[in-house]
């Protein structure tokens, strides 16, 4: 299947089962289905107005997705996944561009992504998309109420 037959659309709560199956298929290990990624949590996130989930479909099958969020000053690209059977065809690049546009449409002029150190492929992809690694003594820290959040 060619990239031309792939369509990007905004996902809704109706797409929850397909989305979580894609996350699992793609090996996204940070998914918390009992917490921050539960159906109820996703409903709250989508209703907040600061999160957009975009999906890439081929013939009705969800083969890629990305979450675009913002805090009103900076946009974030999260959870970029492509089904392993459809990788290396430009789909992730298209999803990044679509997420960037969604964030710009909401007024974001800074767009960032956090990339795990054991994912050099993702880092290379974002570099290719024009992102610059910001390595000036910044550390990511978080405080979580539970492992599922």
Per-segment meaning from a language model:
Residues 3-5, 143-149:
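Generic C-terminal helix-cap and adjacent flexible tail
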Residues 126-127, 131:
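Conserved active-site tyrosine of GNAT-family acetyltransferases
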Residues 10-78, 96, 102, 133-137, ...:
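Acetyl-CoA-dependent GNAT
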Residues 86, 90-98:
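Conserved acetyl-CoA pyrophosphate-binding loop and the N-cap/start of the following alpha-helix
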Residues 80-87, 115-116:
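A short, internal acetyl-CoA/4′-phosphopantetheine-binding micro-motif in the GNAT/acyltransferase core
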Residues 103-115:
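Conserved GNAT acetyl-CoA-binding A-motif
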Residues 113-123:
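Conserved beta-strand-loop-alpha-helix junction that forms the acyl-donor binding cleft
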Residues 89, 118, 149:
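Acyl-donor (CoA/ACP) binding surface of acyl/acetyltransferases
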């Amino acid at each position: 299947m060619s990239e031309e037959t792939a369509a990007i659309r905004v996902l809704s709560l109706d797409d929850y089962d397909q989305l979580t199956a894609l996350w699992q298929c793609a090996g996204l290990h940070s998914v918390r289905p009992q917490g921050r990624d539960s159906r109820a949590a996703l409903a709250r996130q989508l209703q907040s107005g600061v999160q957009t989930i975009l999906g890439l479909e081929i013939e009705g099958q969800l083969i890629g997705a990305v979450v675009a969020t913002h805090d009103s000053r900076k946009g974030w690209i999260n959870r970029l996944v492509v089904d392993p059977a459809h990788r290396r065809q430009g789909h992730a690049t298209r999803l990044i561009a679509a997420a960037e546009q969604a964030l710009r449409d909401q007024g974001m002029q800074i767009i960032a992504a956090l990339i795990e150190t054991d994912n050099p492929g993702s880092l290379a992809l974002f570099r290719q998309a024009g992102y610059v690694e910001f390595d000036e003594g910044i550390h990511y820290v978080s405080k979580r109420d539970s492992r599922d959040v």
